[in-house]
A protein has these predicted regions:
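Surface-exposed, beta-sheet-biased, low-hydrophobicity segments with strongly acidic/polar composition
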Residues: 1-156
Length: 156
């Protein structure tokens, strides 16, 4: 809900967007272009949120990191000149019950490759304010790293 107070220029520079699937209790990493199209443009109202495919030049892509990717690998990334892995876009979903840390590989629309580390996942809940019960969306805390030669570039 913090998003609604952002300036239009700030909204347009968001490179990562998340979608929560209440049925499967999972958080999906999605392309910001896809989310803008689904939420703002009313063009794809009949499309299923998690099965739509975009092929646009500034399309952020994700893939789950291998199971053997560790915190040590993540910490070394900013000291490396390159992060060589074969990137294959795939659905990146994190169950809200997942053990943390967990990792997602990311490739920005400009081809920069890096890693997102999920540090914690807060499940959906409710809170009572003034005697009224309100839903609280799930949340994640995360950080990102890119190879050293990309660390000074703008991620967009």
């Amino acid at each position: 809900n913090l998003y609604k107070d952002l300036a239009e220029s700030a909204k347009k520079s968001i490179d990562i967007s998340l979608a929560y699937d209440r049925t499967n209790q999972a958080v999906y990493f999605e392309s910001p272009i896809k989310m803008r199209a689904l939420l703002w443009h009313n063009t794809y109202q009949s499309e299923n949120l998690f099965n739509y495919s975009f092929d646009l030049p500034c399309h952020t892509q994700y893939m789950p990191a291998p199971a053997d990717f560790t915190n040590e690998d993540f910490e070394k990334l900013s000291r490396q000149e390159d992060f060589g892995f074969t990137f294959t876009e795939s659905k990146a979903a994190i169950p809200v019950t997942a053990a943390t840390p967990c990792f997602i590989f990311v490739q920005t629309g400009n081809g920069l490759k890096g890693v997102i580390r999920i540090n914690s996942i807060i499940p959906e809940s409710t809170e009572v304010i003034g005697g009224i019960t309100y839903p609280v969306n799930p949340a994640i805390t995360m950080d990102m790293k890119f190879p050293r030669n990309f660390s000074e570039q703008k991620i967009r």
